[in-house]
A protein has these predicted regions:
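A short, N-terminal "cap"/entry segment at the start of jelly-roll beta-barrel domains
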Residues: 1-53
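Short acidic-glycine-tyrosine-enriched beta hairpin
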Residues: 79-96
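Short, conserved beta-strand element in jelly-roll/cupin
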Residues: 57-72
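Short beta-strand His + acidic residue motifs that chelate non-heme Fe in jelly-roll/DSBH
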Residues: 72-73, 103-108, 116
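Short acidic (Asp/Glu) patches
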Residues: 46-52, 56-57, 79-82, 99
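Conserved small/polar residues in nucleotide/adenosyl-binding loops
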Residues: 130-137
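A short hydrophobic beta-strand segment most commonly corresponding to one strand
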Residues: 110-128
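Tight coil/turn sites that cap or link beta-strands
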Residues: 38-44, 91-92, 98-100
């Protein structure tokens, strides 16, 4: 799994029932909070039940689970092993999803909360981010 990378957090301090984390991502210029209720799938399957995926050409994702569990499917034909299933929880660090990587995620049965500390370039267009036109980004 050498193609899959994580940005690990740094623990500043631990006290009873409290942990302080540094979750900085260098050059991040956007933060998205993604909340799944229950075992949600994003993007959802299409009308005939086929899987759908997101792909970004002007954004690198850094998806970090804040609460719950999330499983990502990643497809990148430039990797030695193009298909990966990656399970994340709070201790995993941020999953780095490079430009040009098809991806989708499924939450555990109790849902999940993820922060994506993205790095977006000047050609990023939020209007195309989550539509069927995203492949034309």
């Amino acid at each position: 799994m050498s193609d899959v990378e994580f940005k690990k957090h740094r623990v500043f301090r631990e006290t009873q029932d409290v942990i302080f984390y540094d979750i900085s991502v260098e050059d991040s210029n956007a933060s998205d909070l993604v909340v799944h209720e229950g075992s949600a799938v994003s993007p959802p399957d299409d009308s005939v039940g086929a899987k759908q995926f997101y792909i970004h050409y002007h954004q690198v994702d850094h998806n970090r689970v804040l609460k719950g569990e999330r499983t990502f499917e990643l497809v990148n034909v430039e990797w030695k092993y193009p298909y990966h299933i990656v399970h994340l929880n709070r201790s995993s660090g941020a999953l780095i999803i490079p430009r040009g990587t098809w991806h989708r995620s499924t939450s555990g049965e109790n849902g999940s909360i993820v922060i994506n500390q993205a790095i977006r370039d000047d050609l990023f267009n939020h209007c195309l981010l989550y539509t069927s036109d995203a492949a034309d980004e």
